[in-house]
Amino acid sequence: MTIQLLPASILVTITVIAVLCLIFRWFGLKKVRSFYVWIGVLAVLGGAWAFLFPLAITADFGKDGDGAALRQMLIYTTGGVLGVITLGENHRKNSLEKAKNDQDHIRQVHAERRSRYTTAVEQLSSDKASIRLGGVYTLVGLVDEWLADEKTTPSLEERRKEGQVIINNLCAYIRSPFLLAERAEHLDIPYTKDLQKDFDGDIEKFDADKRAFARDKAALGEERQVRQSIIKAIRERLQDFGAPGSWSNFDYDFSNTLFFYSTNFIFSHFDAFSYFHGVTFTQNAYFSGAKFTEYADFSKAEFTKYADFSGAKLFTGNTNFSQAEFIRANFSEAKFTSADFSEAEFTWDADFSEAEFIRANFSEAKFTSADFSEAKFTWDADFSEAKFTWDADFSEAEFTKYADFSGATFEEKPIFERALGDKTCKARFACKAAPEDYNFEVSPDSPYKIETEEKEYNGVKFRIPKGAILFDPDGSSEQKDDNDS
């Protein structure tokens, strides 16, 4: 095969120029779109090679020659490559258009939500309860929308961030003062004023006062409905058939709130921070079966009616009830990791029967009637300087490590041993603790002392309450009862 120099030279020159065009496009001609450069270069190259290459190699264009077939093949190849590039460009354009449309849709959806959010927040300040309630339902729905919207907001963290903003607004509404709440106790009973006694027979003043009472009573009831609707919506989303709910990972700040209505968080899961610092519950507060897996702050809270935390699992995080005030409190079967009840005050019943503590601080707490029967203290049990004005029942309570009753005051004899039918329920103290970990030196002013006796285990002597059992926490149940001497 012989090479014709002229067509070969022209072909090489065109090819070099085409390659240089591509290089200049890459480094310099940024304003010219790649698609048009590639199309132009390939069209020129394809045509040049189809026309010149057969000539350069002196292909036979006769009837039986291969020149025409080679040229046709090069033309088809060039056309195919150009077609593929064109299809790729169309796909790119369609993808960009789709991405743009998706972004426009996302912006539209988010803008529409934020517009609804702004309107709903404004509705919360309306003087009409129905409008405020509508704002609440809108905000609740928006939180659910954000959490479920994986399409426009793929990041779960971002969805929760948007939801937390709305949760903060709902909590802020709960925290906001309502003037009539201070008169709730008066407005909750029927109108009792007398025409003659209170108004000297002035019927106009009597009727005006009665109408004002009815108006305020209705306004109080409406506001209760709005706020209880918020609490109900939160509670329903804090649980899912025993599992955490869709709203369990949000922080809740109810600090210094006046709950002038019954509060129900039964079986709720709080998997983030929950703040009830300084709150006042004027009606019953129900937290039975609730779970707090992060920090739960009830410090300086005031429970003026019944506080039910029975079966609550206040674990993983710390639980702070320091300086809280209770009338009647039920913590039976509750579980705590680190519970701080220091300086708490229990005006009437305090039921901690069968409760479980890893660390418990009741220092300087005040009890009227305290039931710690069958409670378990795995680590610290600090009752130093606590005051018990009535029953203090520790029968069948179990202390595994550290028990401190130093400086405590008992107005009645503390119970560490109690007969229950044919059974004698005795407190248990672990022999694995150091003898000095048990301190029963109550206050010198205490009318009743904790009577102690010496017991020995494997040659180590302990002083524990009289009638109590010294047991080995690593041994069998029979050893627990039979190893005191």
Predicted regions and their residues:
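Membrane-anchoring/interfacial helices and their immediately flanking loops
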Residues: M1-R25
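Extended N-terminal export/anchoring regions of large proteins
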Residues: V16-I17, L55-T58, F213-D216
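Membrane-helix interface "capping/anchor" motifs
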Residues: F24-F35
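Membrane-embedded hydrophobic alpha-helical segments
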Residues: R33-A111, S115, E122
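N-terminal leader/targeting and pre-domain segments
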Residues: D104-I106, A111, S115-E122, D127-L133, ...
